Amino acid sequence: MKQLFRQWYDLSEIKKELTTRNWFPATSGNISIKVSHDPLTFLITASGKDKTKTTPDDFLLVNHQGIPVLETELRPSAETILHTHIYNNTNAGCVLHVHTTDNNVITNLYSDAVTLQNQEIIKALDIWEEGATINIPIIENDAHIPTLGEKFRKHIQGDSGAVLIRNHGITVWGRDSFDAKKRLEAYEFLFQFHIKLLSIQGGVSNGANSYS
């Protein structure tokens, strides 16, 4: 029970911080944190909640299938299946899914992936080579969540990572809440920088294909 309260507090603090950045517009987005490994349980945001508010009903505890562990009238976030795929296939401890203007714009500029390089902040992703290059996959959105989940699952590689969904934000996971938030901040910085650079240069660069 102590671990549950500790993780609840941790997730609540992340929600507050990301809310101040307006990364949960119009109740969008969902975040989760692992509570136990065996059996697998994790806290996830309840569906349809205004994340600018803090209430006792912000999160609910679910199992490895995304089913509530305790009796509740709350419904887990619609994209819970993305979180279950990550927790069931990695040792990740936290998953963050947010919608921002920048990450949505990026998915309209590129088709299957966006390539970013030569930025010091890439080191926040535990990539230490000078002039490092990263590729972030982009998948098509799908209103049928199980289908979206299968597309997403193919790109889960390791205990940390990120996947962009066309016009549907980014999902980032990490070893724990600190790692996941750090990675999310790094990706959003890179997107913002890249878009500003393109606006100055006047077009899509880095040899990637534009999407239309």
UniProtKB/Swiss-Prot annotation:
It comes from the Bacteria. One of its GO terms (molecular function) is zinc ion binding. Its cofactor is Zn(2+). Disulfide bonds: none annotated. SUPFAM superfamilies: AraD/HMP-PK domain-like. It catalyses: 5-(methylsulfanyl)-D-ribulose 1-phosphate = 5-methylsulfanyl-2,3-dioxopentyl phosphate + H2O. Its EC number is 4.2.1.109. It holds the Pfam family Aldolase_II. It is an enzyme of class 4 (lyase). One of its GO terms (biological process) is L-methionine salvage from methylthioadenosine. InterPro entries: Aldolase_II/adducin_N, Aldolase_II/adducin_N_sf, MethylthioRu-1-P_deHdtase_MtnB. Keywords: Amino-acid biosynthesis, Lyase, Metal-binding, Methionine biosynthesis, Zinc. GO terms for cellular component: cytoplasm. Pathway: Amino-acid biosynthesis; L-methionine biosynthesis via salvage pathway; L-methionine from S-methyl-5-thio-alpha-D-ribose 1-phosphate: step 2/6. Zn(2+) binds at residues 97, 99. Homotetramer. HAMAP family: Salvage_MtnB. This is Methylthioribulose-1-phosphate dehydratase. The lineage of its organism: Bacteria, Bacillati, Bacillota, Bacilli, Bacillales.
